Amino acid sequence: MKRYLLAIVLLLPFILQAKVAVEKPRSKQPTAFAIVVDQATYDKTAPQIHAYRDVLEADGLSTYILRDNWQTPEQVREQLIALMRKTAKRSPLEGVVFVGDIPIAMVRNAQHLTTAFKMDEDNFPMIQSSVPSDRYYDCPDLQFELIARDTTDRLLSYFNLACDSPQRLDPAFYSGRIRYPEQLGGDKYEGIARYLEKVVAERGKVDQLDNLVTYAGDGYNSDCLVCWMDERVAIDENFPLTDTRKAGNLRQLNFRMDDYMKYRVFDELVR
């Protein structure tokens, strides 16, 4: 009996690893991209995810789809590091998007790496004084120490940035999230599906950027107006179709303009 138990224990890591389903790219491109999605979201939105994959490959990205019933951030990080190493020579991993309910790393002991967030970690609850950060995923050189799993939100895990870890941010790839806000109500899977359909539709349009809105918030380098002296030059160089002579084409907002600037920002998003 003990031999059987020992065999099961030894095989357990391989069994868990085998659960992750990896859909390989349909085309070979210079760089690679990964869609990381939870199994429930994939089951409800598979056609939209595949259509999204196809437009990414049309843009020149060999796109992988990684899906599983993700339980911890460690599982996701392990798979991304493995994929990054696998693709390093022939098609380096360029970026990742997390779709649906992907575990979130709540990072502590790292406020020297944040731009504006500063809070006493000793006197405030962990949920408030920790930083939800995907640098846990896209900075594989950083070292973390697990503190605890959240008891009310299964997606949250708390980590300390280790003292012997590199103390800088140097992402190996870019990352983003597609997640439906619970505050909106309704079916989150339908919401994600609609969003992906919209993304695919927009990718099929020939529509060059000719309207731009910028916003400089409080508690960042926007406090120093000198830092923004050359912003107009940078905008002209990067967005040549934005006619800076027309007020409606380029709007630059600053937190000093109003006591409650978020409503003006919301208006711009609606516009």
Give a label for each model feature:
Residues 19-271:
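Cysteine-dependent hydrolase recognition
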